[in-house]
UniProtKB/Swiss-Prot annotation:
Residue positions binding NAD(+): 324, 343, 400-402, 407, 429, 453
GO MF annotation terms: 3-hydroxybutyryl-CoA epimerase activity; delta(3)-delta(2)-enoyl-CoA isomerase activity; enoyl-CoA hydratase activity; long-chain-3-hydroxyacyl-CoA dehydrogenase activity; NAD+ binding
Listed PROSITE patterns: 3HCDH, ENOYL_COA_HYDRATASE
Protein name (record): Fatty acid oxidation complex subunit alpha
Record-marked site positions (Important for catalytic activity): 119, 139
Amino acid sequence: MIYQSPTIQVELLEDNIARLCFNASGSVNKLDRETINSLDAALDAIQQDSHIQALVLTSAKGAFIVGADITEFLGLFAQEDSVLLPWIAEANVVFNKLEDLPFPTISAINGFALGGGFETVLATDFRIADTTAKIGLPETKLGLIPGFGGTVRLPRLIGTDNALEWITSGKDQRPEAALKVGAIDAVVAPENLQASAIKMLKDALAEKLDWQSRRARKQAALTLPKLEAMMSFATAKGMVFKIAGKHYPAPMAAISVIEQAARCGRADALKVEHQAFVKLAKTDVAQALIGIFLNDQLVKGKAKKAGKLAKNIDTAAVLGAGIMGGGIAYQSASKGTPIIMKDIAQPALELGLGEASKLLAAQIKRGRSTPQKMAKVLNNITATLDYTPVKDVDVVVEAVVEHPKVKSMVLAEVEQNVSDDAIITSNTSTISINLLAKSLKKPERFCGMHFFNPVHKMPLVEVIRGENSSEETIASVVAYASKMGKTPIVVNDCPGFFVNRVLFPYFAGFSGLLADGADFAAIDKVMEKQFGWPMGPAYLLDVVGIDTGHHAQAVMAEGFPDRMGKNGKDAIDIMFEAERFGQKNSKGFYAYSVDRRGKPKKDVDPTSYELLGAEFGELKAFESEDIIARTMIPMIIETVRCLEEGIIATPAEADMGLVFGLGFPPFRGGVFRYIDTMGVANFVALADKYAHLGGLYQVTDAMRELAANNGSYYQS
């Protein structure tokens, strides 16, 4: 053994070829400070051993290196530039040392080599991957850019345009795509990975492969004609800004770094990268996006833990076909759980099967599936008009019409037709789980399972715990949602559960603005362009359905009359009474039509202004700050109430629910990250300015106390 540490072992193989193996004590290899320090020491030991003539980098884990340890680096990001800049420069000395070894080097990549893991392999002369590999630089998804030489080495390896696309998109790359552009040199079967890597090193030693010129190219300036460079970077900036927008600075920063460093050698190019990395690491956007990443890990960790308590879910059933039932059936079947789709009407079953077929056909069109896979998924969906095929399923998802009496009747009926240990769930957005449980003989085997529409696109599932739901029931439904490829969060029963409970105060703030004369289109523009929502409140109501919103609003008003009760008509009532239900009947706040490409198109509709004007009078202009405050303060305070009341367990789960369930702007990180970034005391002061508008704008005593103690919701 040439070198050994808790994370890295180096040994001599045949023909004086050394193997450096990443082998951390945990389940995966991460590029943390300990690993970087070990790599530095290992390279020193390698340099001091005169027998070594070549080096192969391998991993003893199922993945090469999954990336940097972001939890550890968050502490570093909080340091002053005078600390962070020298640290990243020193870390890069290690990768330079790897790149400068006096003999050929290769990385044998299995599984993930992402972020710092991919930057590590970029420092070797050759890269060979097995068929399981995924490589890439996802840092821009975290509000950062690569900091270990990725913006320097990758453009010099695969060309500027390819590197710009890889880095700004942050997407993982399959080995075939990486081979095509030259990011790796070969793709082999997993069992042949190390042997193939050693053969390449032997070819390099025999001068069949020119490792020295490859290395020199990575360390030199980019060989790109000036005019071509100008066009390349200008095109990239235009395309990337169109996608990323002003709220996500990292992709644009990556382009600027590569452009500035294009005429530089390695040393100066790395300095450009380091300066930009440190600047981005300090931004609120990076903190928010890293926070989402960590919150996602927490939620997935909880789901994994729940899996240990869960019963096996091998077969499922959905009651109620149509669009929602078809979407649920598609999601379950496509992720490997066969599902029975039951309805009382043959046309509904045909609609449900048609929805699943349509979604599968779209996957084939995008190149993400094949006719063979489509057939397999459709074979996993069994349509039926009676309960006979349902009797042996492990879990049932009731997805009939959103009406308490109908749901209660169906739930009682299905309980008589399934095994005693089957779990029954209700896909409801507003109806109390405790109320529905009264129709069942075994309420402990029952909970809510709220999917969001469209099911195949929306990642969130709310798992709603009733007062009698057993832990096994909750754990099993969480595990089933995870198996379906969804992100489950567990919430306790209350009107609206979590997501709808916090959404409708936002709509109430919107309605209040309209009652005071605001222009709904102007509100949408501010909330989309400035705050960052994918849709403003008027557009969102049209998409959800004004009739659906009207019903849910009544449920919320009944559940929380002090805060959500109304005096007189609001904008939702006006649209509902005028039978303007939104996209579903082509008229809501906006008018809807289909453009030449067959896509929905929205236009401002004078009729909406006439209806609202008759009730609320002439339009008035509002400052953007007022619009944001009056819509967001109610949502934020209601989210805080949900945490304080135990409806949602943690700020992390609340923020993930908002981002995945409502499209809360990721660059803001969720409600609790938003409050912490603003400062709790600053938010309380802002809310107090609007407290006269009613209970939705009045902060809780606990929040006021947190502000007084200079506290925060996330503990740093």
